[in-house]
């Protein structure tokens, strides 16, 4: 892996180990490269992968367009987060399990006052979820379910009977993105990460609550009708983000884009 941006001593042609040589980065180096803002303000970032022709999935899953370096970054972003938000459809399709504690991040998380692993927060309007799965019954830290006040009462009851904390973050059937963020922050989860899917990310984009996008560009073409990284109603005025970091490995590009004025 090599750093392309920002241009620093590490990206010059200076000979030696600090040059932009193609090598595997340590988890500590990745953690520094993807650190949250140090001032403690709430921060919502998304982590997504896309092909050259804009597909966010292949055969319904993201794994087919990912790579080992992308998965290292995926693990790093989880290792830094207080909470991971995921849409119910993505949780089902990708077979989400409880986040695990990783020794490589233990000291860093303890120093930041974080638990041993990030909380998984599943976003669902209908709560069509199997609450007997390990994600809900055997997590290291309790899983949350975010929904609206109009969610089916029997499914809310089923979740609570399984010991799941149901967080109401909207007056209708689904969540209101800004309210969901506020509910998480109120629980001390200021370092927020969403892994999609496209529908959930589209909601955050449309509501203007996304602070950062970590986007992997996979050097493949898939054609077909796969979703983009964000779907749903469009925004009236496109919101501008600025490129803050760019890494490369084996043709994959790993970018960070921050909302203008919040970098």
What do these predicted ranges mean?
Residues 1-263:
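Enzymes that bind and transform nitrogen-containing heteroaromatic metabolites
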């Amino acid at each position: 892996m090599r750093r392309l941006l920002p241009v620093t001593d590490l990206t010059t042609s200076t000979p030696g180990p600090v040059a932009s040589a193609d090598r595997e980065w340590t988890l500590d180096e990745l953690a520094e490269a993807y650190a949250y803002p140090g001032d403690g303000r709430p921060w919502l970032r998304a982590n997504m992968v896309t092909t050259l022709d804009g597909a966010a999935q292949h055969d319904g899953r993201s794994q087919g367009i990912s790579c080992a370096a992308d998965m290292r970054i995926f693990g790093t972003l989880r290792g830094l987060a207080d909470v991971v938000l995921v849409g119910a459809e993505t949780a089902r399709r990708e077979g989400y399990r409880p986040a695990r504690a990783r020794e490589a991040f233990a000291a860093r998380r303890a120093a930041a006052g974080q638990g041993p692993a990030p909380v998984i927060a599943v976003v669902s309007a209908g709560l069509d979820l199997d609450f007997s799965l390990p994600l809900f019954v055997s997590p290291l830290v309790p899983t949350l379910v975010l929904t609206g006040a109009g969610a089916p009462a029997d499914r809310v009851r089923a979740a609570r009977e399984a010991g799941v904390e149901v967080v109401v973050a909207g007056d209708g059937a689904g969540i209101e993105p800004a309210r969901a963020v506020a509910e998480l922050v109120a629980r001390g989860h200021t370092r927020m990460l969403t892994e999609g899917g496209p529908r959930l990310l589209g909601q955050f984009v449309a509501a203007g609550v996304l602070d950062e996008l970590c986007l992997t560009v996979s050097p493949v073409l898939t054609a077909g009708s796969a979703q983009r990284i964000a779907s749903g109603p469009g925004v009236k005025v496109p919101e501008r983000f600025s490129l803050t970091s760019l890494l490369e490995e084996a043709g994959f590009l790993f970018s960070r884009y921050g909302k203008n004025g919040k970098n």
